[in-house]
Design a protein with these regions (language model features):
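Phosphate-binding and adjacent anionic-ligand microenvironments
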Residues: 1-173
Length: 173
């Protein structure tokens, strides 16, 4: 999202978990488009609630109007703004690991995997921004004994390295 927003240039708002926060931004006319990882999407002027069907219809419309497949359109977009790789993993935690991790997530970190942390965002627990195109976010689930780890990087090898570092961060004492 940020890569695309930077290209246009428009602001990006990161909210806590819950589409209600995105709906509020739409109602306040702060954003035109809002989405979340579960394919929930809303566009100002439509429903201020998440709607996966709208997202699918808009993709179908883009394919029909442009005469190019989704894959072709993504390739063109990535050529313009640069590709990013991302992943979400759930790591199941034993109670002692969970307690230790919660304390670690509340600290401010200057380095992650020997790389400098340029910025910390606490909108949703701990997001460590490493540079313009790489970051790691860790947050405990509110419903099960897992930590959700999100990583983004410009290449697959860098993403794999971030995932390995995140797993080590979670499980190392």
């Amino acid at each position: 999202m940020k890569t695309l927003a930077d290209y246009h240039p428009v602001p990006v708002y990161q909210t806590p978990v819950g589409f209600k926060y995105i709906g509020e931004l739409i109602k306040e006319d702060k954003i035109v488009l809002g989405g979340e990882e579960s394919a929930g999407l809303s566009i100002r002027g439509h429903l201020p609630e998440k709607d996966g069907i709208l997202a699918c219809l808009l993709v179908a419309e883009a394919v029909a109007r442009r005469g190019a497949s989704v894959k072709q359109q993504l390739a063109a977009l990535f050529k313009k703004v640069g590709a990013v790789e991302n992943v979400r993993i759930n790591l199941r935690l034993e109670p002692d690991v969970q307690k230790r991790l919660l304390a670690k997530l509340q600290r401010d970190w200057e380095k992650f995997d020997s790389r400098p942390v340029r910025k910390i965002d606490r909108t949703d627990w701990l997001k460590m921004i490493l540079d313009d195109r790489a970051w790691v976010l860790m947050r405990p689930s509110g419903t099960e004994p897992v930590v959700r780890v999100y990583c983004e990087a410009p290449t697959q090898p860098e993403l794999d390295r971030l995932v390995a570092a995140a797993k080590a961060f979670v499980f190392e004492p």
